[in-house]
Amino acid sequence: MHKIVFVTGNKGKFAEVRDILKNFGIEAIQNKDGYPELQEDELEPIAANGAQYVANKLNMPVMVDDSGIFINALNGFPGPYSRFVEDKLGNPKVLKLMEGEKDRSAYFKTVIGYCEPGQEPLVFPGVVEGKIAYEERGTGGFGYDPIFEYNGMTFGELGDEEKNKVSHRRRAVDNFLEWFIGGA
């Protein structure tokens, strides 16, 4: 069985990725130590840099995830700053920013960064389109899940099993697996 260190302190992210990878004979090992995060306007360099840093530090294959919600009416805000905005403002204030906005379209994007020690990092994006709900709905998931609507239901309403079939993270991990299994 392949082993990959997945660097995140987020229990929800780890559980989602672990459950996907185990179906392909890959054991995800959680590492909560983190890494110096670049301040960039794009997710790809953040994920690539983090994966390379930790792979070289631990001398093991490493996967990191950088994700964001991009709200079109807010010019892509909060984007790569989603975690900071969630911590400082939370969903209620994001909904307040959206008051009166007709364009509620948004997308979640995850970029998986993967690196083996001494190698160049690779990135695997995944995107899911949706819209911002008018209120928080559902108790499932984490982060922006209760305000991100996909096919009429928020990710918070879908439940983990259904969400994990269609999420941005699932799509990014699937892109990684296509490369990893195809090249393994």
Swiss-Prot record:
Keywords: Hydrolase, Magnesium, Metal-binding, Nucleotide metabolism, Nucleotide-binding. One of its GO terms (molecular function) is dITP diphosphatase activity. Gene3D superfamilies: 3.90.950.10. GO terms for biological process: nucleotide metabolic process; purine nucleoside triphosphate catabolic process. Binds 1 Mg(2+) ion per subunit. SUPFAM superfamilies: ITPase-like. Transmembrane segments: none annotated. Mg(2+) binds at E37, D66. Substrate binds at T8, G9, N10, K11, G12, K13, S67, F142, G143, Y144, D145, K163, H168, R169. It is an enzyme of class 3 (hydrolase). One of its GO terms (cellular component) is cytoplasm. It catalyses: XTP + H2O = XMP + diphosphate + H(+); dITP + H2O = dIMP + diphosphate + H(+); ITP + H2O = IMP + diphosphate + H(+). Its EC number is 3.6.1.66. The active site is at D66. Its cofactor is Mg(2+). InterPro entries: dITP/XTP_pyrophosphatase (IPR020922), ITPase-like_fam (IPR029001), RdgB/HAM1 (IPR002637). Belongs to the HAM1 NTPase family. Homodimer. Pyrophosphatase that catalyzes the hydrolysis of nucleoside triphosphates to their monophosphate derivatives, with a high preference for the non-canonical purine nucleotides XTP (xanthosine triphosphate), dITP (deoxyinosine triphosphate) and ITP. Seems to function as a house-cleaning enzyme that removes non-canonical purine nucleotides from the nucleotide pool, thus preventing their incorporation into DNA/RNA and avoiding chromosomal lesions. This is dITP/XTP pyrophosphatase.
